[in-house]
Amino acid sequence: MSSQQRSKKKNNSRLYILIAAALLLVVMIVLIAVKCSGGKKNPNTDSTSGEASSQPLEAADIDPLTGLSGFKAQGKRPIAVVINNSNPARPQWGLCTPDIVVEGVTEAGITRMLWLYSDINKIPDKVGSLRSARHDFVEIAEGLDAIFVHWGGSKYAYSAISDRGVDDLDGRSYMGRYFFRDKERTNVAIEHRGYTTREAIDKGLTKLDIRRDIKSGYQKPFAFVSESSPRTPSGGACSNIDIVFSSYCNHSFTYSAQDGLYLNNINGAPMTDADGKQMAVKNVIILYCPVSLMGDSSGCVDMDLTGGSGVYLSNGAYENITWKKGGPHDMLKLYSSDGSELKLNPGKSYIGIVPSEKEARTVIA
């Protein structure tokens, strides 16, 4: 081999060494970079992460009871007001103002209502007529961490309030200060004339130093679709539903396609407030549950609020649902037939807790 060939071979060897060293350096840099990043993929290039990040987050101003935007009282406790629904108490003051109206039977088949407000500022200048508490309504309010407003109560209701430390404002204790008797409805008994006001409730909560912020770990009670993406229940069309609580009280809700709401009729006549406005809601929710007597001379009933079946109506259609509450502290939850949490259309709701024995008398048309 000539000296020229030996020199060329030597130069080639040096070149190979340099190339190998460079490649080794690149590999080391890559390994160090991966180690420092924890071996995680770049979320900006991961298609799965990209899909997840594109999911819209719930806006901070969504009302927990209606699902409507523009809510200004985030973090505040709802207010639950017990309302009289016997014949002499109608028409009620403020009937069309609650976010949710819950109705259930009491003694002798008479129904009582629980009006739920997500914000104290939604309560009108006059709300009533107020009535005494029943333990089932205490449990519903308790599950929502709501402040409970009532005028008197059964012994079972007072036991529930006392034993479980439910925050309440009671007209029996504060008549003339935060609770009043209407002076114009002189044609009905005095127990049908009780009312309160937004200002009076506000003053009462301040005087009694009642907690106004929701408790730690609080979860919103209901799921809603967005206002821009309304849903139609999957069970079929429903322009009207008839429900029966007892021989004393029955309702029908008739769908108005013009405004997308269900109009409430009670005992064959429009259910209107003191100003003549008919109650109308976006969502009608019927829950069936066993109802039994407490077994004493009081005539009080007990609604088994463990859970059961029901019907959901909205946008002119219906579907079968299930529901669950469980214990007194537990929140009422609604589920679709497939077991997923029921998603409501944003708007006001009516929840009727109907005795199971009356389920067969429900008529959907």
Regions found by a protein language model. Give the residues of each.
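N-terminal Lys/Arg-rich, disordered targeting/topogenic segments
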Residues: M1-L15
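Hydrophobic single-pass membrane-insertion segments
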Residues: V30-P43
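A surface/extracellular/periplasmic glyco- and lipid-processing/surface-interacting theme
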Residues: S47-P98, E107-A365
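Hydrophobic membrane-insertion alpha-helices, especially the h-region
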Residues: I19-L31
